[in-house]
Amino acid sequence: FFFAMCHLSLSEKDYPEPELIEGDIVLDESTAFAVVDTKSSGKRRRKREVPGNRIELWNNAVIPYVISDKMGIKGRKVIRKAFRNLARRTCVTFIPKQAYHNDYVKFIAARKGCYSSIGRKGGEQVVSLGDGCLDRGHVIHEIMHALGFFHEHSRFDRDKYVKVLWWNIQRGMERNFLSYSHYPVDSVNEPYDLFSIMHYDNKAFSRNGQDTMQSRKNPYLRFGRHRSLSQVDIKQLTKLYNCPTPPRRSRGFCYNKYSRCSSYAATSDACEKSYEFMKIYCSKACGFC
């Protein structure tokens, strides 16, 4: 996946900058187990294990959310596009946080760019989106982390499909290309997917503009930089969250009843503040379906 370091002039000072692994994953109590690895040279693959620790999923595939007041019009538009893409193709649902929701995601604009925790953490958890992250692909990628997904190229079988060109990687960034043991990366028996929205692109963390990863089958194949879920991504989400097959929603079900819905959704917090009304009359613009 195309990783962009991104910064904003307006920062949300109330949120401390977290320690990150693999560029955009928050290192917390649960993911800390995942980065414990055995000693070996930086150029060899190291398997990482998560003993007795499980990533928590969201109940009934429902994600309560809050969008920061500092998120501008562009950010709100892109977040809602990501909601629509996921809701249309899977059973995942995004609804504004209500008083009875204890666990929820807050989308913020912070100094350190794009990042998310893995899975449901309990209480408020942050998805950070800076200027360079405000496109649909980046937002979906970070939401997928929050849904419980690691990077595709961290899979235990990665080296069968991808060759890592260690000599082209920026010094000190080699740790971003280590692979996990079979657990905690749960591929739910789906094949390795070069076109997953969770896969780095060919030149991720390149020190010289050359490829850092290549397909073993076709070194010239370009991957990463995807803007939408791949078919394998959809299958994995469907299995992980026990979604109905096909998804319970369809394009024909999702529409706006007012011509100004898109404007309301993009320029205000109407989707959140007037949820019951907007759910009925502007469900598509708000990304509720």
Q: Which residues fall in each region the model found?
A:
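Amphipathic alpha-helical interface elements that mediate macromolecular binding in regulatory proteins
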Residues: F3, K77-R84, S196, V232-K235, ...
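Compact disulfide-stabilized, cysteine-rich extracellular microdomains and processed peptide cores
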Residues: S196-I197, R225-H226, Y241-C289
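Disordered inhibitory propeptide/activation segment of secreted metzincin zinc metalloprotease zymogens
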Residues: F3-K74, K81-R84, T90-C91, S206-D211, ...
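Amphipathic alpha-helical protein-protein interaction segments
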Residues: G72-G75, C133, S187, F223-S230, ...
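Surface-exposed beta-strand-to-loop junctions
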Residues: E56-I63, G119-G122, T212-P219, S262
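Metzincin-family zinc-dependent endopeptidase catalytic domain
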Residues: K39-E56, I67-K203
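Residue-level detector of conserved, well-ordered beta-strand and adjacent loop positions
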Residues: V66-S68, I108, S128-G130, L165, ...
